[in-house]
């Protein structure tokens, strides 16, 4: 089952996506897409790893080369997040982003978290506009394939396709 969870900054999307994964009794995998650029990023990653360890997630670092991720046949994976992955694809040679369907075929459930950054109403030029268009294409393509699509607003999930996975 493929579930796409969208939301703005601090909307509760990540917490909601994690709660979906925690409902399953299957092995849990966290596909981490953040690239560590500095000490602040490293501290954030360490904090999140510690939080997930208590919840029995196995972390798979995949800021690039998502196509190389190998997961056991049964399990539930949480990919956090498509915004990072899209940026990595745009700004890194040989970037990832095209291979989410391959990852989905490896596990029983895949929950994807993505950013809702299209409501600002501002026009951007150059790289920012290119990034927003790329992320919109990724979100649209995955929403079309997904069994469930929801947007989290103020911590409340609103489903546009499917419903709460059991």
Regions found by a protein language model. Name each.
Residues 2-71:
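Conserved P-loop
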Residues 46, 50-98, 109:
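Portal/gating segments that form or line small-molecule/metal binding sites
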Residues 8, 81, 114-116:
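Short secondary-structure boundary segments
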Residues 27-30, 77, 110, 115:
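Hydrophobic beta-strand segments of well-ordered beta-sheets in folded domains
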Residues 17, 48, 78, 115, ...:
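Residue-level signal for inorganic ion chemistry
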Residues 28, 44, 49-54, 74, ...:
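Arginine residue identity/basic-tract feature
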């Amino acid at each position: 089952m493929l579930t796409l969870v969208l939301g703005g900054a601090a909307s509760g999307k990540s917490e909601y996506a994690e709660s979906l994964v925690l409902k399953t009794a299957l092995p849990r995998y966290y596909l981490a897409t953040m690239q560590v650029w500095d000490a602040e990023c490293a501290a954030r990653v360490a904090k999140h790893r510690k939080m997930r360890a208590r919840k029995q997630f196995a972390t798979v670092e995949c800021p690039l080369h998502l196509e190389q991720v190998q997961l056991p046949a049964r399990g539930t994976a949480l990919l956090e997040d498509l915004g990072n992955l899209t940026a990595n694809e745009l700004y890194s040679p040989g970037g990832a982003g095209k291979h989410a369907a391959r990852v989905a075929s490896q596990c029983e459930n895949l929950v994807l978290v993505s950013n809702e950054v299209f409501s600002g109403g501002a026009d951007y030029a150059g790289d920012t506009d290119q990034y927003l268009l790329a992320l919109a294409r990724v979100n649209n393509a995955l929403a079309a394939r997904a069994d469930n699509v929801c947007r989290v607003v103020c911590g409340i999930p609103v489903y546009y396709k499917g419903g709460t996975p059991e």
